[in-house]
Amino acid sequence: MKTIDLNCDFGESFGVYRLGKEEILPYITSVNIACGFHAGDPLVMRQTVQLAIRHGVAIGAHPGFPDLLGFGRRMMAVSPEEVYAYVVYQIGALAAFVKAEGGVMTHVKPHGALYNMAAKDARISEAIAKAVYDVDPTLILYGLAGSELIRAGQAQGLQTASEVFADRTYQADGSLTPRSDPQAIIADEDEAVKQVLMMVCDRHVRSVQGTAVAIEADTVCLHGDNEQAVRFAKRLHAALQNEGIAIQAMRKETRR
């Protein structure tokens, strides 16, 4: 039976600012929790870990650039050494809360501009993979399907999860269409569901240029920061089940 993980970025509130809907949790299997750099704060991190444990979803760290004002979506001129330190720091912060609450951390998924940079920059992706491995070699590294980050994780000896997006369009080279492009976002829910089923079942996606691009899908990213998020998650969950696809979190491989 085919399986797929449904993941969602979570815990991206901080201070008095609130973002994300708890109602989406019954329809996903993994959460990527902000670690205080692009969003989140210590109290939100702890509360989000508690929420994830209560709902039985897999817990992952979501490290990003230190950029609250830009929500971690702005590119920064950083060295691999800086990226390594950023990632170790943020994984460590979340890991402490997970341990304190009696949970288990399963994965790491970079956020925003760091994620996009790692998709194409081999040195940045290698720094991220090494940081994850050095903290805990059993953690699963999430990255854009077919990206440098997936290759770096595999080369480092990490288990990886190739991620695809429900509401983002793709270029002919398999990269995501930049958010600055009017065609970047799929607003039509029917089209988004159709795209996910194509990627999961047929292992390809239709690019904005009209070409079929081969793609590996281990996990699907759902965005939980808009009004339609819960409705769409529920609908996609049902559509996948109707196709006989099991929805479950990534499982750590047994390593010898």
From Swiss-Prot:
- Where does the source fall among the domains of life? Bacteria
Cystine residue pairs: none
Catalysed reactions, as listed in the record: 5-oxo-L-proline + ATP + 2 H2O = L-glutamate + ADP + phosphate + H(+)
Listed InterPro entries? Glyco_hydro/deAcase_b/a-brl, LamB/YcsF/PxpA-like
Alphabetized GO MF terms? 5-oxoprolinase (ATP-hydrolyzing) activity; ATP binding
The EC designation for this entry is: 3.5.2.9
Q: Which UniProt keywords apply?
A: ATP-binding, Hydrolase, Nucleotide-binding
One GO BP annotation here? carbohydrate metabolic process
UniProt cross-references to NCBIfam families, sorted A to Z: PRK05406.1-3, PRK05406.1-5
Matching PANTHER family, A to Z?
A: 5-OXOPROLINASE SUBUNIT A, UNCHARACTERIZED PROTEIN YBGL-RELATED
Q: What quaternary arrangement does the UniProt entry report?
A: Forms a complex composed of PxpA, PxpB and PxpC.
Tell me, in a sentence or two, what this protein's role is.
Answer: Catalyzes the cleavage of 5-oxoproline to form L-glutamate coupled to the hydrolysis of ATP to ADP and inorganic phosphate.
Q: Give the record's family classification.
A: Belongs to the LamB/PxpA family.
Task: Output this protein's name.
Answer: 5-oxoprolinase subunit A
